[in-house]
């Protein structure tokens, strides 16, 4: 049975009832800070589209935001991969002999940073002639203290690390497939005045290049004149190859009455004009370059139904209360 047929039956039932009753994820592009040391790097995320055999220079500012301590920093090259579907990356050490380790050459591998001061770390990215097309993921890491955990005077000293993430894509023929894995609301039927809406969607990629999704979400039955237009990827988040990334938004109800209002949890709250009765489409599109470098567009859609049954219940209770008060008061007035 299609949603339209369900909608028509529910709408008919709702009209009958109404008659009777009278009635919201990265890599985040924020500077990363060590847990207790106040060491900050910026920019925290860098992108490079590179030619084979070319060299590129970058500068990362390493800031000591502590009031008293001076730190000696070591420059390291690590890699990172997708962690959770919420976009938290996992930084991993490169194994000995990994060629990517040699792509980065620091002008100064070790340096000191005084309190409330900073140091500009300059390094070059040298892309080998034989590098294969595709994306490479480098974590330019700065570490305080020794290279290993040591025990001194019964105290364990562990180095602190902070990293700037570098996305390198070597030009050439790449492989990329993109699709919506999921696109759905927490339910299909809502009271437009009292129920919160939660939309969750997941985008997946396959191939050898990362993706920064571009596109929009349109709320409304006419995509040319939508009730709301929302960014598909509001934080410019990245999706690494062969992984999924979860997104979503919430729209909270306008009325707040105990026992009736049902709010939803989510980090991204948006404003949507809901019809008081009927159906409403939510459509999303994503635009990306395919393996041939041509722009491709994919679209997905869901539909929700609004029935103001809770408002009808409020009206029914109000009418019943008024009627009860009238019949209680009527004998008294009759005697008078």
Language-model-detected regions and their locations in the chain:
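C-terminal single-pass membrane-anchor helix
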Residues: 297, 301-336
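Ligand-binding face of N-terminal immunoglobulin V-set domains in extracellular IgSF glycoproteins
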Residues: 57-63, 70-77, 89, 101-154
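Short beta-strand and strand-turn-strand segments in soluble, beta-rich domains
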Residues: 38-42, 87-109, 221-235
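Membrane-proximal extracellular "stem/stalk" segments
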Residues: 173-310
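N-terminal edge beta-strand
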Residues: 33-56, 181-192
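Short, solvent-exposed loop/turn segments enriched in Ser/Thr/Gly
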Residues: 42, 53-59, 119-121, 133-139, ...
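Short proline/glycine- and polar residue-rich coil/turn motifs
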Residues: 49-52, 111-119, 235-245
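Short acidic, flexible loop segments centered on an aromatic residue
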Residues: 70-98, 142, 204, 208-225
């Amino acid at each position: 049975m299609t949603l339209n047929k369900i909608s028509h039956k529910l709408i008919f039932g709702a009209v009958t009832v109404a008659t009777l009753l009278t009635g919201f994820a990265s890599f985040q592009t924020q500077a990363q800070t060590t847990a207790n040391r106040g060491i900050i790097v910026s920019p925290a995320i860098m992108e490079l589209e590179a030619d084979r055999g070319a060299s590129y220079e970058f500068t990362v500012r390493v800031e000591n935001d502590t009031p008293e301590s001076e730190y000696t920093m070591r420059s390291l090259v690590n890699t990172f991969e997708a962690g959770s579907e919420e976009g938290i990356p996992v930084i991993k050490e490169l194994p000995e002999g990994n060629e990517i380790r040699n792509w980065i050459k620091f002008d100064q591998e070790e340096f000191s940073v005084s309190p409330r001061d900073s140091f500009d770390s300059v390094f070059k990215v040298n892309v080998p002639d034989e590098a294969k097309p595709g994306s490479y993921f480098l974590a330019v890491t700065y570490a305080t203290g020794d290279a290993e955990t040591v025990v001194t005077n019964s105290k364990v000293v562990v180095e602190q690390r902070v990293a700037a993430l570098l996305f390198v894509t070597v030009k050439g023929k790449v492989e990329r497939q993109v699709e919506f894995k999921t696109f759905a609301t927490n339910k299909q039927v809502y009271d437009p005045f009292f129920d919160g809406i939660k939309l969750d969607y997941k985008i997946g990629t396959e191939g050898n290049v990362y993706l920064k999704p571009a596109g929009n979400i349109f709320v409304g039955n006419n995509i040319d004149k939508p009730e709301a237009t929302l960014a598909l990827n509001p934080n410019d988040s990245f999706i690494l190859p062969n992984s999924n990334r979860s997104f979503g938004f919430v729209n909270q109800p306008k009325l707040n009455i105990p026992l009736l209002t049902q709010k939803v949890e989510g980090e991204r709250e948006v404003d949507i004009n809901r019809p008081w009765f009927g159906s409403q489409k939510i459509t999303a599109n994503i635009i990306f370059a395919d393996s041939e470098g041509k722009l491709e567009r994919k679209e997905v859609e869901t539909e929700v139904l609004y029935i103001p049954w809770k408002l009808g219940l409020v009206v029914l209770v109000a009418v019943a209360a008024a009627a009860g008060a009238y019949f209680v008061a009527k004998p008294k007035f009759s005697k008078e």
